[in-house]
Amino acid sequence: MEEQLYLDAEGPLLPLHTSISLFLMSYCDCKTWKIFLVLPDSKANNLSKNILLPRNLELETICKCDLPPLVRGCRLPAVVEASGAFCRAGLAVVLRHITHKAHIAEPSRNDIIELLGFKKTCLKACAEVSQWTRLCEISIPRAIESFLKKPSATIPTEVLQFEKKLGEPVKVHNDDKIRRQKLQQQMTANTNEAVDAKSNTAKTMPCFDIITNKTSLELGAALSKLTVQGALSRATREPSHIRKAKNSDLPPLEHVFAEGLYFTLTDVVLLPCIHAFLVALSNVAEEKCSELPLIAAWYKRVQQVPGVRFAASMCNITFLDILCENAKPQKMLSTFDSETEEKEIQDSNFVGGPRPTMTKLKELGIEAIFSSHPCPSWAIDWESLPAAASPAEGKMSSERAVRKQQQLNNLLSVVTNIAKPGDTIVDFCSGGGHVGIVLAHKLPSCQVILIENKEESLLRAKERCSELGLINIWFIQANLDYFTGSFTIGVALHACGVATDMVMDHCIKARAAFAISPCCYGFIQNTVKTSFPRSCRFQEALNYKEHMILCRFADQTAVQLPAERRQIGKQCMGLVDLDRAWAAEQNKYKVQVITMEPESCSPKNNMIVGSPI
């Protein structure tokens, strides 16, 4: 049975996330999927007449109440396997999965697998850490959907940000080779012009047959990667004077596509969005399009990619004819920076130790508070568990497996003490599922859900669960923001940086109890949804820079460091987590910060335990 793709179809027009997904499906010409357009319960089987669907795809409609249980707890788009126990949710995750499956179905189509970019990492990182994922998955679709509802002559900031990015220097693997080829092409063209001024045809580089006198070497290089067999190998080396040319003498590369030189999923995401925006902008203020010369040039180049015009015609997209002569970045764009980028520049180079900040807090009566462990001697009999349930089954040394068992003992002692039959327990940032698998095995009357953004980790967890024959466990590959289902307990072992705060916020919103082990304090920083300090009392005492000092030094707890520095690091950990605990208490939670037993189980041995009052 094929996988099922669920797309939102609420409203008079298709949401951009849905349009993007359908555009990719048309580009890949996928035939092995069952595609559902999800309608509100009251409008089941009543798709808006304004919606034009792709002509090369078969689609069905379904109402929300009939969705599979796992899909009901996720934001769309979402893909669910035939078993109904493994779901992928969120635009970036779903698009990457569609691309993988399409290439498996047609291995000869190099243009499909090249969408994933260098090392197959395009849109792999979550929006919290990747500017491109954030721009494609959140910023651009959200801004343009708002613009479409109320078009005006004001260009959204997010679109200007994309224009700015198209003017940034190209960063591409092995660019030295391509720049030398460009130098040789330029020198060859100059020689030909000198020999025969009447000739308009320059010699074609043997590496890129597709290049013409109207096509840049960069675009030719990009398009050659999208042919069935990919780019041809160079038959000969460059001449000596080309090989010996200094790097500083090589010509720069043109910014061809969104992320640089090659056509990727990023372009697939942005094309339907930018097209819809340009159509709307042209209707209200056509002259404003001239303020986006780089986007206009990109918009034309994308249309030259094999398969794009076919997908566009299938999706009822009629491209606009936009002038983009001498596309250069506008002067105003050189000074454009998002608030986030400005904040990062402002605070990235601060200096100073933690003592002044700690002293300041102490004078205000704020010191790290560690509650006693509720079950310090509680431990699972790991020897009695099936091998697949033990961390030793994962890819780690025996010494590390023992420490992992000790860490699990701490979290599991809390969860098993409060869990009741019928509870839903979510293992956030689950990785290979060490916490969730043991919980599912020990608590068969509870439903366990693993949520993890890394597909490889989740697939390993799925294999282990198959060995154990567990039927009370579900898997969701997604950023945790895309999980919207109800649950009673949330757990996270070593949630990295701001992920701890995201998990806590998710639990508080669901009024669920939580047991979280924070990690990577040095990666904590303000995000679109989360700002620091977290609690009112810490906000009154510290500014962002002072809080970041605590976070940086909270990471200095490694065993090889001097004891005094480790102790300071532990106190900084305690203060950062105290701020988190007080923030939760402001939302009517009872919260404790506890040290794991034994303390040697991890340098990051804090545990934040909370329950709604």
From Swiss-Prot:
Main location as per UniProt: cytoplasm
Subcellular location per UniProt equals: Cytoplasm
User: Could you state one GO cellular component term attached to this entry?
Assistant: cytoplasm
Family matches, as Pfam families: Methyltransf_32 (PF13679)
Q: Which UniProt keywords apply?
A: Cytoplasm
Boundaries of every GST C-terminal domain copy: 116-312
> Which Gene3D superfamilies does this entry report, sorted A to Z?
Vaccinia Virus protein VP39 (3.40.50.150)
Q: Which family does it belong to?
A: Belongs to the GSTCD family.
Q: What is this protein called in UniProt?
A: Glutathione S-transferase C-terminal domain-containing protein
Native species: Xenopus laevis (African clawed frog)
Q: What is the lineage of its organism?
A: Eukaryota, Metazoa, Chordata, Craniata, Vertebrata
